[in-house]
Amino acid sequence: MKVLQEKILNEGKVLSGDVLKVDAFLNHQIDPVLMQEIGKEFAKRFKEENITKIVTIESSGIAPAVMAALELGVKVIFARKRKSLTLQDNMYVANVYSFTKQETNEISLSRNHIDENDRVLIIDDFLANGQAALGLMSLVEQSGASIAGIGIVIEKAFQDGGKKLREQGVRVESLAEIASLDNGTVTFVQQETAEVK
């Protein structure tokens, strides 16, 4: 997705060979026009899949998930990382290791909002080692719902998450695939190398 790649090049910051900071438009400050385009692109790619619900994880997956849901005319349910006083019982639960935060979180979805009749599109902001996506897949599988695919805003293709998911036969659609962050430079898969400011 060209507009997303341009945004990464213009506003993203490479912090290391593993970490790309995109808080200027995706996971802290949100660019709603970009999110709208991302939502349209996910909807276009998954329109034939009869999606009934989108599942994501708080908090950075919510904006792209809501925009895709708006385009598809479905609801979004987001997995919580923290326990809520109002959501105690009747939950699907999985453990997810965060590459960025270097910690394990227990994530959960209410059983009241997803069931075996749902066809789910999972959406998240990043795909690195695949732990968040695998955790979300576990929650969806616990509900008995089927998984139509996974939509990723930015995939770090140099890490093994995408490979793990695709080897399981899951359809993964990434809007920007990064081949490398070496030397402070973003290199997209099948794209020219460009310097990040």
From Swiss-Prot:
It is an enzyme of class 2 (transferase). 5-phospho-alpha-D-ribose 1-diphosphate binds at residues 128-132. The keyword Mitochondrion does not apply. It catalyses: XMP + diphosphate = xanthine + 5-phospho-alpha-D-ribose 1-diphosphate. It comes from the Bacteria. GO terms for molecular function: xanthine phosphoribosyltransferase activity. Pfam families: Pribosyltran (PF00156). Belongs to the purine/pyrimidine phosphoribosyltransferase family. Xpt subfamily. This is Xanthine phosphoribosyltransferase.
